[in-house]
Curated annotation (Swiss-Prot):
Keyword Ribonucleoprotein part of the UniProt annotation: yes
Family assignment from sequence similarity: Belongs to the universal ribosomal protein uS2 family.
GO cellular component term of the entry, any: cytosolic small ribosomal subunit
Signal sequence segment: none
SUPFAM superfamilies, A to Z: Ribosomal protein S2
Protein known as: Small ribosomal subunit protein uS2
GO molecular function ontology, one term from the record: structural constituent of ribosome
GO biological process: translation
Matching PROSITE patterns: RIBOSOMAL_S2_1 (PS00962)
Length: 248
């Protein structure tokens, strides 16, 4: 689903931070300032947003995985909802150091999480003492909070979508180290350096965050749908050729 400049205006995408907190590297994307607040140039944001969505759509069409990352308070619920809507992995609580760079160890914790979920389902819990069962439930809750969003992510993601590149410095550093492309929302107070697909915009308003996250989720679903259509189309063409061959 395409987004218009009016929708961006209504969501407050153009409101940056106080002028004294700005990053000079964001100068090309700033329109001016009003009441000591930087105003982001939505003409540029819209074009860059569309470029980022095209990239996400293409990646999803090629069976790529995009990891959603948004752990600050106003982003958590939105990131989780939109990632789940499009069946993508997400990190909505704390970014654990090594989540990408030490993925092998993280996978062991994810295996433990899966094993514990099996124990909960197959009645193993009933055979434990009350204290053991309670300890297990607590550990499961803790693991689910940290790793629940990536428990079905078998390999490193092909790209990462980040709300607030300053807040998610750890995630950005790890992705860059591994050469994982980053689609990032960059507000006027942060540097766009190291972000492959920069979307200049407000990273604090929940309306703006919803607009970005919904856009990425929609692009992923569209990309997957496009891939299915191409397969179906290919099958039809092959069938037509086969029929034509038989008739010839």
């Amino acid at each position: 689903m395409s987004v218009t400049m009016r929708q961006m205006l209504e969501a407050g995408v153009h409101f940056g931070h106080q002028t004294r907190f700005w990053s000079p590297k964001m100068a090309p994307y700033i329109f001016g300032h009003r009441n000591k607040i930087h105003i982001i140039n939505l003409e540029k944001t819209l074009v860059m947003y569309q470029e980022a969505m095209n990239y996400v759509r293409q990646l999803a069409a090629n069976k790529g995985t995009i990891l959603f990352v948004g752990t600050k308070r106003q982003a958590r619920d939105i990131v989780r909802e939109e990632a789940m809507r499009c069946g993508s992995p997400f990190v909505d609580q704390r970014w654990l150091g090594g989540m990408l760079t030490n993925f092998k160890t993280i996978k062991q914790s994810v295996k433990r999480l899966h094993d514990m979920e099996t124990m909960m389902e197959d009645g193993t819990l009933d055979k434990l003492s009350k204290k053991e069962a309670l300890d297990l439930q607590r550990e499961l809750e803790k693991l689910n909070r940290s790793l629940g969003g990536i428990k079905d992510m078998k390999n490193l993601p092909d790209a990462m979508f980040v709300i607030d590149v300053g807040y998610q410095k750890g995630a950005i550093t790890e992705a860059r180290k591994l050469g994982i492309p980053i689609v990032g929302i960059v507000d006027s107070n942060h540097s766009p350096a190291g972000v492959d697909y920069v979307i200049p915009g407000n990273d604090d308003s929940s309306q703006a965050i919803r607009l970005y996250a919904r856009g990425v989720a929609d692009a992923i679903l569209e990309g997957r749908n496009q891939a299915i259509q191409e397969i179906v189309q290919g099958d039809f063409e092959e069938a037509d050729e086969a029929v034509a061959g038989e008739q010839g």
